[in-house]
Amino acid sequence: MLQCAPKKNERLRGSCDFCTQSKLRCNKNKPSCRRCTIQQQPCVYSVARRTGRPPKHPRTANDCQEANGQHGEQDPVTSTPGGSCQQQSNHLLDVEGDGANFTLADASTTAQGRETPASSALDNALLVGETFGFSSLLDDPLIQSDDFLSFSLCMPPGEEEGHMASPRALNGSTGPCSPTVLSSIDVPHLPARFGFLESSVESGLHGRTGPHLVEQPDKIVPSSFSEMEKIYDEGLTFSGLDSAINAVTNNGKGEPSASGTMAAHPHSKRQCFCSTSMSKLQMLISHPTLCQKNSRARFDMTLFLEEVVFNIHRDVLQCLVCQSKSLHSLASLCICTDWVIEALRDVAQDLSSGQDNLGGFRAGLCPPKDKFSICVGRFVLDDQLRESCTRSLVKYRLRKLVPIMDTMMKLNYRGAGGALSQAIRTMVEDVRHKIESALGMMEL
């Protein structure tokens, strides 16, 4: 027994120290496991501590290899095929206690006669982690934060019905989508023509008062659509707004992309980068110039924001953090998608009632050369083609969001339930109902 002691003391853990503390498993063959990569720390395999008397028949890697070589069995937990016990031996689970030192194969054999709901739940959690590529349902730093339990939609209503509040009204709110959570994020300086947007968003995010920012609502925010028209006429309609949203949502780092975004911010400890982008996008949507009183959003602005929201949907599905069930990201997606669906449904209502919101601002500015001319940038369409083109475009945009909402529902089902998960399920179902209602209205 004394001769075996040095060999046992030199034996390293099958899982790294970080995973062992959380009672998780990882692969020792890899230079760094997924959990350590998320936390941005190297894997450390210390010597396994063994206290108490060793078991009567300890199983080693060689014994396991011989057994698998003869019988060709598969381990019921790790599902490792026969002859590949070297990979299975890397998942040794060391439990500290009186004479408790066994492998996952021993644990599964012992648990066959006394299976409990807790053990089956643990197996299901490990299975879900292997299926979707994350180590634990509680791995997401958003779910571990205190704001996860106190989540609330912090978008206070405006003074009158149908008018969303200015970002300045959000300064006193709290929650994951509020400016207080985003106070540590720097907003870059935008070009001169985006001065109203930069000042408004910066005041909404940082809540600055004093010498840094002087409140001048008349100069910061355009007072009417005529001033917004001048900004549009300067080439801001699509390319300029694209630069503005990229500067606001990506901190001035260029085009939004899943690979570049996660490479620059692979796993942020403060907040998921996708959730941060969507929170800022919500503030951009609630800007007074986009939601005027007794008026509807411009059609070109609606189409552009729908494209931005669709790209964020795609980035979230490829984000490493959001793949581990970030409920905050799903909630923000529901909010932004609901805004776009409402705006598209307004267009469908106008078309059904014989009205439209396309020519109100561009009529007479650029008359078409003939009845088949369609000016996409200025949206000056022929009277006979305007309704049919708009109807086809709105149908396409609405149907494109249907599979996205189905994917969001599947991601939400991966959770263990709770108030936020139920709220997301309700929002997704409401958005789906609005899409079907708008499509039915277009068919009529």
Curated annotation (Swiss-Prot):
Keywords: DNA-binding, Metal-binding, Nucleus, Transcription, Transcription regulation, Zinc. Coiled coil: none annotated. GO terms for molecular function: DNA binding; DNA-binding transcription factor activity, RNA polymerase II-specific; zinc ion binding. Residues 16-43 bind DNA. Residues 49-89 are annotated as: Disordered. Gene3D superfamilies: Zn(2)-C6 fungal-type DNA-binding domain. Its main location: nucleus. Residues 76-89 have a biased composition (Polar residues). The keyword Zinc applies. It is found in: Nucleus. The keyword Zinc applies. Residues 50-59 have a biased composition (Basic residues). SUPFAM superfamilies: Zn2/Cys6 DNA-binding domain. InterPro entries: OAF3 (IPR050675), Zn2-C6_fun-type_DNA-bd_sf (IPR036864), Zn2Cys6_DnaBD (IPR001138). Pfam families: Zn_clus. Transcription factor that regulates the expression of the gene clusters that mediate the biosynthesis of the host-selective toxins (HSTs) AK-toxins responsible for Japanese pear black spot disease by the Japanese pear pathotype. AK-toxins are esters of 9,10-epoxy 8-hydroxy 9-methyldecatrienoic acid (EDA). On cellular level, AK-toxins affect plasma membrane of susceptible cells and cause a sudden increase in loss of K(+) after a few minutes of toxin treatment. Gene clusters encoding host-selective toxins (HSTs) are localized on conditionally dispensable chromosomes (CDCs), also called supernumerary chromosomes, where they are present in multiple copies. The CDCs are not essential for saprophytic growth but controls host-selective pathogenicity. This is Transcription activator AKTR-3. It comes from Alternaria alternata. The lineage of its organism: Eukaryota, Fungi, Dikarya, Ascomycota, Pezizomycotina. The gene is AKTR-3.
